[in-house]
UniProtKB/Swiss-Prot annotation:
Keyword Metal-binding annotated: no
Protein's UniProt keywords contain Transmembrane: no
Function: TFIID is a multimeric protein complex that plays a central role in mediating promoter responses to various activators and repressors.
InterPro entries the record matches: BTP, Histone-fold, TAF8, TFIID_su8_C
Protein family according to the UniProt entry: Belongs to the TAF8 family.
Gene3D superfamilies, per database record: Histone, subunit A (1.10.20.10)
Key words of the record: Nucleus, Phosphoprotein, Transcription, Transcription regulation
Record's protein name: Transcription initiation factor TFIID subunit 8
Residue ranges of every copy of the Histone-fold domain listed in the record: 16-83
Spans annotated as Disordered: 229-309
């Protein structure tokens, strides 16, 4: 038996290709060794139209009987209506020389490259058809919490509590050393090893609530009272005129030396501090001082003095009227 020549099918429909193979196999069974392309396409088209008509008629008989799925009886009625004998189908099926149609080669499905795939994709559930797209990657279902999980280990909790307690005690000690009186552990360095003075105050929270920028205690109030009531002697004024400017300088030096100082009795710690440190940082508590007068500037309220040696007698100049009268 001659082999049928290979025929190229231009159509890419897979069902059309299967029908083309069926027609070629039937031609081989009947002894046809060769077939042209046009005849093979014509026979394929005729077989396709026959199968379509059989299926359409069987569907109509099925709906006429009130059913949705056709049965063997519906197909038999469709064949009989088209004039095809059913009795010849049984011996044709039992024919031993029948050559089966080879199955189409199974093509290996190319797996899509999942470069960013994490994990194994979950299969479809039973109610999802297989032709649906695959499920997403497992990382798409990961739920990332936005907060940190609390630490529940016993050792970590105790260590954290101990660190917090140590930091609180250290900060409180530094705060008390800067705001209250302290004792020095060693006499060399004052700020190396400070100790909090054991002087309880009542109530203890009053020191923290009161402002500490300027504290007015009784000693400072006493000093403020002394400065406010302080009086200074005015410098002596000369009624007459002095002979020279040198005498003015000598008298000015004597008046400065004769100014009495403020008598402050060292009866308190504040007065001692005043005597030791006369310079006061607070400008409002500082004693008022008179501005220094220069050598050439006169004292306010007095006329400038003139020496007799330097002053010359004034000569009156005659007017033009007097000159004319004398000439006449």
């Amino acid at each position: 038996m001659e082999k049928v020549e290979a025929v190229t099918v231009s159509n890419v429909d897979p069902y059309r290709r299967i029908l083309n193979k069926v027609v070629s196999q039937l031609l081989l069974d009947k002894g046809a060794g060769q077939a042209s392309n046009h005849s093979l396409e014509t026979l394929t088209q005729m077989l396709q139209a026959l199968i379509w008509e059989i299926g359409n008629s069987a569907h109509n008989y099925c709906e006429l009987s009130g059913r949705t799925m056709p049965t063997v009886g519906d197909v038999s009625l469709a064949l009989i209506n088209m004039g095809i004998s059913i009795s010849n189908l049984d011996p044709y099926m039992r024919k031993e020389t029948h050559v089966p149609i080879p199955l189409p080669p199974q093509q290996t499905q190319q797996r899509p490259l999942s470069l960013l795939q994490a994990g194994i994709k979950a299969p479809h559930p039973h109610y999802v058809p297989s032709y649906f797209p695959p499920m997403p990657d497992p990382h798409a279902y990961i739920r990332t919490p936005t907060h940190k999980q609390p630490v529940t280990e016993y050792e970590a909790i105790r260590e954290k509590a101990a660190c917090q307690k140590r930091d609180i005690e250290k900060a409180l000690t530094k705060f008390l050393c800067k705001t209250t009186e302290t004792n020095n552990l060693f006499p060399t360095e004052d700020n190396m090893f400070p100790l909090i003075a054991c002087k309880p105050a009542f109530p203890p929270y009053a020191a923290a609530l009161n402002p500490t920028d300027q504290v007015f205690d009784f000693e400072e109030l006493e000093y403020h009272y002394l400065v406010a009531n302080r009086t200074e002697d005015e410098p002596s004024k000369d009624d007459g005129e002095e002979g020279d400017s040198e005498n003015e300088e000598m008298d000015g030096d004597k008046s400065k030396e004769e100014k009495p100082e403020l008598d402050i009795k060292p009866n308190s710690n504040t007065n001692k501090a005043i005597l030791e440190n006369p310079n006061i940082d607070n400008p409002y508590l500082r004693a008022a001082t008179l501005p220094k007068r220069s050598k050439n500037c006169p004292t306010p309220g007095t006329m400038p003095s003139r020496s007799l040696a330097t002053t010359a007698p004034t000569i009156r100049t005659p007017s033009t009227l007097e000159i004319t009268k004398t000439n006449l």
